[in-house]
Amino acid sequence: MKNIFTIDTEDWYHANFEDGLFTNDSNVISTVEKNIDRYLELFSENDVKATFFVLGFVVEQHPQMIKKIAAEGHEIASHGYGHQLVYKQTKKEFREDVYKSKGLIEDLIGCEVLGYRAPSWSIIEESLWALDILEELGFKYNSAIFPTKNFLYGIPYAPRSAHNATV
């Protein structure tokens, strides 16, 4: 499957600004379903398929939405469990976060999860160790490094095209 559209499937409160607004409080008003429905309608009207990088937290809160995305032929990939920045996690925390997310998705949709995107593209030079963990967990590709540098993420010298792409 070759998709040119990707959607980070998270809610408004998962944004990362310095310490962020992040919360895993299920009592916060969610807008993710309404927004994803808009994308699905647009993609359907234009016969487009996309990759949806979904948080494990969103899988738990909106399982029917995730099933609908998959049923419409879109790829479901991991965005981690709780939208924690990779470079703020230990190796152990990162492994547990991604393992949990991958398992939740695979159990729900019955398909192997091949891809991963770090929250806020937070694999930076200091957290390249995460790539080894992703490989150990069976991921075939990642979309987790942004080839520029800003206040939150990026590796300016990173390749701007697929590197050793096999999927």
Indicate where each model-derived feature is located.
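Active-site beta->alpha N-cap acidic-glycine motif
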Residues: 1-72, 117
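Short catalytic/ligand-binding loop motif for oxyanion handling, primarily in non-cytosolic enzymes
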Residues: 13-15, 60-62, 84-87, 123-127, ...
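Histidine-centered catalytic micro-motifs
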Residues: 76-83
